[in-house]
UniProtKB/Swiss-Prot annotation:
It catalyses: (S)-malate = fumarate + H2O. Its EC number is 4.2.1.2. The lineage of its organism: Bacteria, Bacillati, Bacillota, Bacilli, Bacillales. This is Fumarate hydratase class II. It is an enzyme of class 4 (lyase). PANTHER family: ASPARTATEAMMONIA/ARGININOSUCCINATE/ADENYLOSUCCINATE LYASE, FUMARATE HYDRATASE, MITOCHONDRIAL. It comes from the Bacteria. The keyword Heme does not apply. Belongs to the class-II fumarase/aspartase family. Fumarase subfamily. Pathway: Carbohydrate metabolism; tricarboxylic acid cycle; (S)-malate from fumarate: step 1/1. The active site is at 186 (proton donor/acceptor), 316. Substrate binds at residues 97-99, 127-130, 137-139, 185, 317, 322-324.
Amino acid sequence: MDYRVEKDTIGEIQVPADKYWGAQTQRSKQNFPIGNEKMPVEIIKAFAILKRSTAEANFELGLMERDKMEAIQYAADQVLNDSLTDHFPLVVWQTGSGTQSNMNVNEVLAFVGNKWLQEQGSDLKLHPNDDVNKSQSSNDTYPTAMHIAAVLKLEDTVLPALSQLKNTFAEKQSAFENIVKIGRTHLQDATPLTLGQEISGWHRMLEKSETMISESLEHLRELAIGGTAVGTGLNAHPDFSEKVCKAISTFTNKKFISAKNKFHSLTSHDETVYAHGALKGLAADLMKIANDVRWLASGPRCGIGEITIPANEPGSSIMPGKVNPTQSEAVTMVVTQVMGNDAAIGFAASQGNFELNVFKPVIAYNFLQSSQLLADSIISFDERCAVGIEPNHEQIEKNLNDSLMLVTALNPHIGYENAAKIAKKAFADNSTLKETAVELGLLTEEQFDEYVNPEEMTYPK
């Protein structure tokens, strides 16, 4: 392999000749051979958005030549169109401020930008620190990149997926609104409801999650940029932060604002904890929905079997003809991972010592992983399971007629204790509620039919 020699304040170091990174990236690559978890591409692209915006702000403030700004923006755009993916090799497990990934971006943008400047016939030369990182510190750029990446991921990936499944449930709710089935509480038979009503609960869960995620976005829109090293803004123009946030907003077509208190935004990640809490809430709802679906579809002959779901693949390597609720199982595993990520994020966010939290990369990694897993699993569950949910009318009717909890409708007419007598005796004798009520002399057949109407029980007057 051919090498070139790069140097930093530590000294000289060999860098592969075909790579665009510099000395600090190479040192990090050698010093942290830990795991396979690369710095998320969403963070790298967020950095690219940030760097092209800081260059614009520095130019507008008279702190940078136009050619240098354009060179940085050209290089940043190459990152955004995935042309430079191979030049960002660093793992998550590095310095807790993300300094080495900030420098990785600075070095690559300087390298590519300098090639562009040469092609333009310019004598100017970009320096990773003095130009690409001008008016910045890793301490304010990394949390800024975290928030940019989080907002983009939630708005462009998670919320559209959530809306897709929510719309499917709205359609199923309407289609099944008149199918009366038995309800269940404590895993035991309860009073009737319609299948549409049951699914309406799932729909409302997703509506609430959508609202909570959207609310959390407002806090993530605050950016730390301009705080530099400890929050004071040393070496940054007083108007730098506002101009950068405006440039980011214009470029992304999304709202971003300068954080009110930069001391807070460097050492605290409560906004990310809050936003991931909303994702955890969504995950909890998805666990409930996925479990309900697989229980209701259990069988086909010896389970509840009140709905059918698509048969996407063979379910067993030993039992012929078996079909399993695999989409539900995938969702529940994703939920498990998200719950674990939430614990990691919460602990990491609690470790802000003095002016800086140094758990930033692991917070970003887990947040973005949760977001992507949730979005992917929601879409997969929707397209390969939810849209294909259909009622099993025969089983629904059988379970409804077999339920002893229809006796609840008799409470206003014969009292709770007499209704309980009917239910207990019917269960013991394996007889129907009507037969038992008549046998006990508590009701006539006509009275029973008048009082016990499952359809009317689902919409009581």
